[in-house]
UniProtKB/Swiss-Prot annotation:
Entry-linked InterPro entries: Ade_phspho_trans, PRibTrfase_dom, PRTase-like, UPRTase/APRTase
Protein name: Adenine phosphoribosyltransferase
Organism expressing this protein natively: Ruegeria sp. (strain TM1040) (Silicibacter sp.)
Pfam families, per the entry: Pribosyltran
SUPFAM superfamilies, alphabetized: PRTase-like
């Protein structure tokens, strides 16, 4: 029997955070462990070996950690998708729905050039709202999305299906049941 750890083994679950009934999947324990972090980055990169990727787009906030590491490994640029009002300079914005209300994310107008090949990354895929908004921003600037890569998928929330309905290839390292 193998005792090798998987990416999922490095992720801590915190019960009833931030609200009662929520099982928070905490990737900071994965990021803090050098073996776990390297494993996650390597596995997120593996499906794209040999493909042209011009930029990695990371979704706020843990997507910045992953995106920076992945862009470094690829030798490409990194571009953040941020919450409204956090980026200086000229931006474009996209609204998306939350459970109760709406939110807005932004991208610099000059961050992506038409025809650039983009990999979108984040730690967790829930409903796909943030990722879907980021995808729309990239497409507005003419970027071509190669894939969206996540550490965790919460399949009950339907994010993967949502992104696939937008024509996206979706890669995840592990799934957790429950909210």
């Amino acid at each position: 029997m193998s005792t090798s750890k998987t990416v999922k083994d490095y992720i801590r679950t915190i019960v009833d955070f931030p609200h009662e009934g929520i099982m928070f999947r905490d990737v900071t324990t994965l990021f803090a462990d050098p073996r776990g972090f390297r494993m996650a980055v390597d596995q997120m990169l593996h499906p794209y070996a040999g493909q042209r990727i011009d930029k990695v787009v990371g979704l706020e906030a843990r997507g910045f950690i992953l995106g920076g590491a992945i862009a470094h490994q690829l030798g490409t640029g990194f571009v953040p998708v941020r919450k409204k009002g956090k980026l200086p300079g000229a931006t474009i914005s996209q609204e998306y729905k939350l459970e109760y209300g709406e939110a807005v994310v932004e991208l610099h107008k000059d961050a992506i050039q038409p025809g650039e090949k983009i990999l979108v990354v984040d730690d967790l895929l829930a409903t796909g709202g943030t990722a879907g908004a980021g995808i729309k921003l990239i497409e507005k600037l003419g970027g071509e999305i190669i894939s969206c890569s996540f550490i965790i998928d919460l399949p009950e929330l339907g994010g993967r299906k949502h992104l696939q309905s937008l024509g996206m290839d979706v890669h995840v390292l592990c799934e957790f049941e429950g909210l």
